[in-house]
C-alpha cells in the first residue's frame, strides 16, 4: 500500500484516542478550559456516566465569534505564545481537546465575550463543523457533549458501567476543585445527588476548608499544615496525622503549579517522609501543592497532561520529605489526642436493660451514697486496694495504684502515673484530665528513636555474649541473614553461620538488654523477604531498627512500679514522634476533664 496523507477526520480521531480516553477525560479538558478562562464558578452535569451527555458551564471570559471558529481546529489555542513551551502557566496549551472531542462526539459550544452583543453557538459532529449562529447566554461559555464515541463505536466497549464512569468524573472534578478553592464548583447528574463546593476564602484556611469539604471531616481534624521553600520551589499543603491512613495511595493528592498530577517521584517522597510512622501496608493521606518556575517543570510529557518532569527532581523530593517530616514532628503528640470524639464514644456506657416499672427505691441495694462506708472512709479503702495491687507477689493483681503521685508531675504534658491496669496500660493524671498509655507501644518508639540516634552517631553499642546464642533456622533464612550481616552489625547484632541451618549470635545491641535472639532473627528474616532489591540502604536500616525496637521494648503483661511508669512518661515527653509507635498506632489517648464531666452528665 503506498504512503498517503490521512484525512483530517481520521487524524482527529487518532489524536482523540490519546486525549479522550473516557468521559472523565472530556470533563477534565473542559473544566481546565473553564479555569484558564478565569471562571469563578463552574457547573458540571453528566448523564449516563458521561456517555449520553456532558455539560460544563462557566462564567469565564468567553470567546468572540472569530475565536470560536478557530477553537475547534487542531493546535489552535490562545494560551501559548510562539515557541514558549517552557513557560506554560495555564492548564491547557496544546489546542487538542475541543477538536478531539468534536471528532468522536456531538459537540456544541455556546459562548459570549463581555463586549459581544449576544452569544454565539457552534456545533461539531464527527469532525464536521456547522455554521456559527447567534444564541442566548450571559457572559461565559457552555460546552455540551452528546453521544460520546458515537463516531468510533469500537471505543464504547472499553468503557465501564455508568456508575464507574460517573465516579471517575467525580474524582476528576474533586481534584480540580482541590486545586482551585477560590472557584465554586457544582457537580450534578442522574447517577448522583448534586454536590456543590462554594468558593473558599484565599489562604491556608480557605484551602483547608475546601479539602475538608471534599476529603471529609476526619481529614480536616487530622490535617497538619506543611510548608517548605528552597531555591524558588515552594511545597505547601496539608498532611494527615499518622492516625489517619488508607489501604492504598489513592488518598494522596498532588498538584504542580495548580495542575493535578500523578507523579511517582512525589508519591515516593511522601512515602519516605511517613516511613517512621506507618506500617508497610498503610498509606498516608495528604494534599500537597508544589509551586515552581514553569521553566523548571515540563508539563508537555503526555497529551493528557497528568505527568510532569522536574529539571531538579532531587530538590523537589528533598523539599517534600523535609516539609512533611517537620510538620509531623511538630505535631507529634497531637496524633494521640482526642480530637474526633473516638475516645468519648468508646467510654460512653450502654444503657442497662431494666424493667419498665423499675424503681430504685424498691431495689435490694440502696444508692451508694445512701449506704455507710464499712471499714473506713473511701480514701482508706482505695489506699488499701492500692497497696495490695502494688504487691508484686499478689497473683491476682490486675490494677496497680499510686495514691499520692508527686504534685509537680501532674503539670507535666503526660502527667503523673496513677496506676497500671491489665499489666499493659498506664493511667496518668494531668492537671485537666487523664491519659492512658500503651506501655509497649510507647517504649517501642523510645527504643526506635534511640537506635536511630545511635546509628547516626558512632553506631549502636553492643554487648558480647559470654556464650553465643545458637539459633536454628531453615537454610534459606540463614542465607538471607548472612547476606545482610554487615547491615545488622551496624545495629550491634553480630551473627555468623554455624553450619547448615543455624546462626550463631555473638553480640547484641546494648539498648535492647536481654532479648529473644531466635524470635528477633526470624522477624528480621521475614521482613528481609519483603524488601525490594532497589530499596535504599537507609530504608532497610530503618526497617531493622523498627524490628529491633519492637523486640527490645517493655512487653504487655510486665508489672511496672510507679517510678518506672513515671520514668517512661518522662522519656516519652523527651522523645520525638512519641505520639505513635513504629507501626503507626497511637501510644496514648487523652481524655479531658471536661469530657469526663460530659460523660457523667455534669456538663
UniProtKB/Swiss-Prot annotation:
The entry's keywords: DNA damage, DNA repair
GO biological process: mismatch repair
Any single Pfam family the record assigns to this protein: DNA_mis_repair
Disulfide bonds: none
This protein's GO CC annotations: mismatch repair complex
GO terms assigned for molecular function: ATP binding; ATP hydrolysis activity; ATP-dependent DNA damage sensor activity; mismatched DNA binding
InterPro entries per UniProt: DNA_mismatch_repair_CS (IPR014762), DNA_mismatch_repair_MutL (IPR020667), DNA_mismatch_S5_2-like (IPR013507), HATPase_C_sf (IPR036890), MutL/Mlh/PMS (IPR002099), MutL/Mlh/Pms-like (IPR038973), MutL_C (IPR014790), MutL_C_dimsub (IPR042120)
Function: This protein is involved in the repair of mismatches in DNA. It is required for dam-dependent methyl-directed DNA mismatch repair. May act as a 'molecular matchmaker', a protein that promotes the formation of a stable complex between two or more DNA-binding proteins in an ATP-dependent manner without itself being part of a final effector complex.
Family assignment from sequence similarity: Belongs to the DNA mismatch repair MutL/HexB family.
Protein name, as recorded: DNA mismatch repair protein MutL
Source organism (scientific name): Nitrobacter winogradskyi (strain ATCC 25391 / DSM 10237 / CIP 104748 / NCIMB 11846 / Nb-255)
Amino acid at each position: 500500500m503506498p504512503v498517503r496523507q490521512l484525512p483530517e477526520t481520521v487524524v482527529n480521531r487518532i489524536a482523540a484516542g490519546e486525549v479522550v480516553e473516557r468521559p472523565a477525560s472530556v470533563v477534565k479538558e473542559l473544566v481546565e478550559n473553564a479555569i484558564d478562562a478565569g471562571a469563578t464558578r463552574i457547573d458540571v452535569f453528566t448523564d449516563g456516566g458521561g456517555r449520553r451527555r456532558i455539560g460544563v458551564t462557566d462564567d469565564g471570559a468567553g470567546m468572540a465569534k472569530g475565536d470560536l471558529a478557530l477553537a475547534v481546529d487542531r493546535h489552535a489555542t490562545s494560551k501559548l505564545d510562539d515557541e514558549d513551551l517552557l513557560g506554560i502557566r495555564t492548564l491547557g496549551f496544546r489546542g487538542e481537546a475541543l477538536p478531539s472531542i468534536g471528532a468522536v462526539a456531538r459537540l456544541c459550544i455556546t459562548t459570549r465575550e463581555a463586549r459581544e452583543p449576544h452569544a454565539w453557538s457552534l456545533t461539531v459532529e464527527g469532525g464536521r463543523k456547522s455554521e456559527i449562529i447567534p444564541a442566548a447566554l450571559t457572559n461565559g461559555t457552555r460546552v455540551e457533549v452528546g453521544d460520546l464515541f458515537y463516531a468510533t463505536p469500537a471505543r464504547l466497549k472499553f468503557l465501564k458501567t455508568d456508575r464507574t464512569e460517573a465516579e471517575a468524573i467525580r474524582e476528576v472534578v474533586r481534584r480540580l476543585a482541590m486545586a482551585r478553592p477560590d472557584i465554586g464548583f457544582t457537580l450534578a447528574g442522574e447517577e448522583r445527588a448534586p454536590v456543590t463546593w462554594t468558593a473558599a476564602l484565599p489562604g491556608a484556611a480557605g484551602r483547608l476548608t475546601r479539602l475538608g469539604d471534599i476529603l471529609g471531616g476526619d481529614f480536616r481534624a487530622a490535617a497538619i499544615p506543611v510548608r517548605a521553600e528552597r531555591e524558588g520551589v515552594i511545597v505547601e499543603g496539608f498532611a494527615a496525622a499518622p492516625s489517619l491512613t488508607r489501604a492504598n495511595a489513592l488518598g494522596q493528592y498532588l498538584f504542580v503549579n495548580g495542575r493535578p498530577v500523578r507523579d511517582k517521584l512525589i508519591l515516593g517522597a511522601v512515602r519516605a517522609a511517613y516511613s517512621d510512622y506507618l506500617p508497610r501496608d498503610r498509606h498516608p493521606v495528604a494534599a500537597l501543592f508544589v509551586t515552581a518556575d514553569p521553566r523548571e517543570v515540563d508539563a508537555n510529557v503526555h497529551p493528557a497532561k497528568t505527568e510532569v518532569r522536574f529539571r531538579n527532581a532531587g530538590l523537589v523530593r528533598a523539599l517534600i520529605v523535609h516539609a512533611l517530616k517537620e510538620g509531623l514532628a511538630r505535631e507529634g503528640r497531637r496524633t494521640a489526642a482526642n480530637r474526633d470524639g473516638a475516645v468519648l464514644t468508646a467510654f460512653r456506657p450502654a444503657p442497662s436493660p431494666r424493667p419498665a416499672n423499675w424503681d430504685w427505691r424498691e431495689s435490694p441495694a440502696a444508692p451508694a451514697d445512701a449506704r455507710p462506708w464499712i471499714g473506713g472512709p473511701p480514701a482508706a479503702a482505695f489506699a488499701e486496694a492500692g497497696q495490695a495491687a502494688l504487691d508484686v507477689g499478689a497473683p491476682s493483681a490486675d490494677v496497680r495504684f499510686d495514691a499520692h503521685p508527686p504534685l509537680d508531675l501532674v503539670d507535666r504534658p503526660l502527667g503523673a502515673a496513677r496506676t497500671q491496669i491489665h499489666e499493659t496500660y498506664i493511667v496518668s493524671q494531668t492537671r485537666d484530665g487523664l491519659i492512658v498509655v500503651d506501655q509497649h507501644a510507647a517504649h517501642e518508639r523510645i527504643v526506635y528513636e534511640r537506635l536511630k540516634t545511635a546509628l547516626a552517631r558512632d553506631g549502636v553499642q553492643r554487648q558480647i555474649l559470654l556464650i553465643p546464642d545458637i539459633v536454628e533456622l531453615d537454610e534459606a533464612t540463614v542465607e538471607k541473614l548472612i547476606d545482610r550481616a554487615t547491615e545488622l552489625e551496624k545495629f550491634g547484632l553480630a551473627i555468623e553461620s554455624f553450619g547448615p541451618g543455624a546462626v550463631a549470635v555473638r553480640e547484641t545491641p546494648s539498648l535492647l538488654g536481654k532479648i529473644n535472639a531466635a524470635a528477633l532473627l526470624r522477624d528480621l528474616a521475614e521482613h528481609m523477604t519483603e524488601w525490594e532489591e532497589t530499596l535504599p540502604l537507609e530504608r532497610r536500616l530503618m526497617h531493622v531498627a523498627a524490628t529491633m525496637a519492637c523486640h527490645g521494648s517493655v512487653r504487655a503483661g510486665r508489672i511496672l512500679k510507679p517510678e518506672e511508669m513515671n520514668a517512661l512518661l518522662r522519656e516519652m515527653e523527651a522523645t520525638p514522634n512519641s505520639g505513635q509507635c513504629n507501626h503507626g498506632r497511637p501510644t496514648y489517648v487523652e481524655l479531658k476533664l471536661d469530657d469526663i464531666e460530659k460523660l457523667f452528665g455534669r456538663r
